[in-house]
Amino acid sequence: MKHTLVRRAAAIRTATALGLAASVLAVPGSGLAGAATGDTNPGDIVLGTITLAQAAATTPFPGITRTVYQDTDRTWTVNVMDIDPNRAPITFDGSIGQGMYTTQTVQEMLEQTTGVTSRRPYLGVNGGYFDDGVVLDQTDRIYLGDLGGTSMKNGRLLSEAGGGRYAYDPVTGKAVGLRPANSVLMLQNGRPYITELGTALTVRLSDDATVSRKVDGVNRLPGRAGHCLRNTDPANTDVTVAGGVCFDPSEIVEFTPEFGARTPAADLLKQTATTTDDDPGVEVLFNAAGVATACFRPGATAGGIVSDAPRGGHDVPPGGRALEGTGDGAAWLWDNACTGRPVSLHTVVTDTRFGDTVADTWFGRAPAGAVELPIDPAMYATPVGDVLLRDASVVYQVPGDTARAWRTAGGADAFGHLFFVTVEGQKGGTAPLAAGATRSELAQLLKALNLVDAVNMDGGGSTTLNLRDQNGSEPPVTTTTDSAPRHVADTVYAAVGGYGLAK
């Protein structure tokens, strides 16, 4: 079947990406960025002036190898988790914890995956970038769990595309434009791969497809799109972009049951400088059959499904959806969905790297000529940052890359193994490497480990690697730049399951 977003074996992705690269014949983890000479040993990794010596190598679980490297001054600690689904029954997946409305520690999310301690994930790391500008609890640093790009789980789109990251001129290193979609780490049918996904969502009248409107987001605050990095929509001249966040006073945002809480009310941010979320707007609730069961608008004459009330504070119906509108988005919902006329919600997800497209009309009829291909429920996608390796080549080459931080990376090698790599600096240290690694150094490290495709994931205080202990708990084995493990939006993990193939 052509469409990987539907059910194509992800192993084919890895084989396609190889391009018969020389690394196919390499032993995983044996590649070196520099020759082992002088005071270096055969197992060392040399990154320019940095030499990483192997400090420990263990097999904590069947099919999973953990290798720890440290530099000469023990300023860096590098954890390399090599996960081979051919060697043991291992499954790859991700978790959003209690819901898209909040953040939790990686340990909390891993331990909540099942009540059976022996079936909890073997290991997990922090997942995608998220909007840390919406703080729900300042004391415990709990944020709204708005992932910064395309996220999918259980066959549903949980977060819209971030609009792409900046593309850089290889000579000047300057940003020259935006890529059409954001990078994602995909885990599907026991294989990892990395691609770019764009999304397009539309709500329309089922009996008149000419009456339609763009749905701007999924499971986030109307008026604020974190990590959007997109060009201002010419149709919305009142959109402003600041610090990679788009502020739009006219939106429609979809909420799925995975939001996990009541829909957000107007002015949730309580920020005088931010007014794009102030509109009390309109909210419409739809049941699992796609029938509008309630419409809320302040000042409206109550009757039928209409109530005189602002948006927010409502549970998403089981199996259903909620649509919140502000500005002209509120006007569209009031004029159409609140009248009782049937509407359709159409979602398109496009893989801009491999050319696949899925289209799913959640309720109502599909647009004329649309090909309905549901999202594969076996797939988990989390939004990530810069692509570091593609087809066994370092593609992140930005002159003047000096920003250091704790790092988390995910990737795949030529054999379809999933790799998680963390780089910790030295908290409070004064050595040059104490602040962590640059993206360029991380890319060279992943190249030395013989990865084929790899990406930079959320890092800094978010960097976390957790391993299941003998009691079934999931404590972190990494340090943190924060005072305690950070609350993050999702985690990706390796767990019990799958089908080992090796004899």
Report residues per predicted region:
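General beta-strand structural signal in soluble alpha/beta enzymes
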Residues: L123-G127, M186-L187, I194-E196, S344-T347, ...
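Short, Lys/Arg- and Gly-enriched loop/turn segments at beta-strand edges
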Residues: V135, V348-A366
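Loop/turn positions that initiate beta-strands
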Residues: A337-L345
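Secretory targeting and sorting signals
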Residues: M1-A35
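A short "linker-to-beta-strand initiation" element
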Residues: Y193-N231, V358-V387, D391-S393, Q397
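Zymogen propeptides
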Residues: G34-L333
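Conserved, well-ordered active-site substructure
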Residues: Y69, V134-L178, T347, P374, ...
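Active-site-proximal beta-strand/loop segments in catalytic clefts of secreted hydrolases
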Residues: M81-D84, G124-Y129, D413, T422-G425, ...
